[in-house]
Amino acid sequence: MIKDKKVVESQVCQKLTESASFAVLATAKRMERSGKEVLHLEIGEPDFSPPPAVKEAVYKSLEKGETHYTTPQGIRELREEIARYETEFRGVEIDPDRVIITPGAKPIILFTLLSSIDPGEEVLYPDPGYLSYKSLITFVVGVPVPYHLNKNEGFSLDFDHLSKQINKNTAAIIINSPSNPTGSMLKEEELKRLLEIARERELLIISDEVYSRIIYDNKSHVSIFKFVTEDDKVVLIDSFSKTYAMTGFRLGYGILPNELVRPIVKLIQNSFSCVPQFIQRGGIAAIVNGQEYVKAMVQEFERRRDRIYELLKEIDEIQVHKPEGAFYFFPEIRIDIPSAVVFAQYLLENFGVALLPGEAFGEQGQKHVRISFANSLEILEKAIRRFKEALVACKKSTISMS
């Protein structure tokens, strides 16, 4: 008799990490179902609804029957609108034929890697940095290699460490500005220096700029795209999720070198086929009619950032950097704790505050936690008070965090 053979998870899939954000959220939801109050500082999602014009555009598209397949690259109208917007916002002429629409930003990052990285080639990514970079590089059978950000200088790019990480097997560098989780931004001189390194070593740069509109203190975002020439290998990644509070719409895009457009379109044809047309209509409405809405949302984020920064600065047990963009704080815990993972669990179970441990963002995130201020000021203030209470309790060493 032939024994039943169980389906075994592949080696590649075994190497992928699960999202820490959703894991913490799941635990928090279980606690809430049991009647416990949880203050949510873990998920990186704007607590706003999309601009009304977006929903109206989607309704109209559905009423018109735009519910069938459309072009894999994305409808022409949206690509033209993105090109116009990006030309104006980033200060460089964009060809609509270089724009590709995907369901969120992750697929365009994944497809860029799939279309340009061969097995065994190395891809550099920031540490601390967005937790999916390492998994996506692993998924395409590349070799993920972290480079450090200098926390003592506002999480600026550590070029000494970056240079040591580059070798003959290096194929690409991922950058993220503003940064998740640190909120830091790469400066113009850093971007120019990075571009020179990429030119010298013939490296691809993947620039994740999904937080580029969420900037504070009247500063302007500087994109590496501002300095590229036709010969540079640079991919720009952006999304509607954060800018327009459209996380559930799953709408992102990439602006790519001409050589990568056809390979990525092939990957789309063989995977999700296309982004629904009615969702893309919402994207057009967001760009055309949502700019004042974005300004108001960013103003509210800045108000929260300033208030929470005041509260965090009063906590002796941490060191905190004031974020320039995005909606995260990434404080370092300066007392003796087993790990940020253990502390985050202790904080959730005993004080009802959900946040993310810094280890989820790389080795350099040890003893850090990520605090999302995408929540009401009332909840944020309450959560920070509990955060402080937990730190004081740990410092006294009278409470076990095991």
Residue ranges and their predicted role:
Residues 36-41, 55, 68-71:
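Short N-terminal amphipathic alpha-helices
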